[in-house]
Amino acid sequence: FGVFFGLFPRGLQRTLKFKAGLDTPLSDCERIITNLKAGYPRLAEWQQVVKRQAEARKYSETWLGRRRYLPGITSNDWGEKSFAERCAMNTPIQGTAADILKLALARLIVGLPERPWLRPLLQIHDELVFEVPEDKIGEAVSFIKACMEAQPFPQFDVPIVAEASVGPTFGDMAEMG
């Protein structure tokens, strides 16, 4: 996904090395990025539009209007400017995902008084962890999925699919079918 946020071939090479243990030649990384951009022909155009808007405004926005200010976007230092540009491209995607999760959390909170047995424990990026009695797992999963899969706002026409895993500990989770 880094390519969507402006990852360069050398960055892809490093990511493949340290996260997947692959020694990928730089030329292969260049080809991967070129092919990805060919598969998504409007990607490069979108990236340029986002960078130009961010430079003009000095911030980038999520789809719901939450702003991320980018003081380095006009820097003469290439590293600082490049980082700000990647942040500008990241915000509409990852930031909007965070906004959607916050809306799902609000729906969950409203339903908690009727489900005193459902105990939210923590959030990890786009995951929510709950403590639930075994005899309430089915009911809990149905409720949580409904809250998380609800369309966050009218203009959002992308289906949201939430997956559920259960287990006695966080380390022993198994995906539910």
Per-segment meaning from a language model:
Residues 1-177:
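Conserved catalytic core of nucleotide polymerization and phosphodiester-bond processing enzymes
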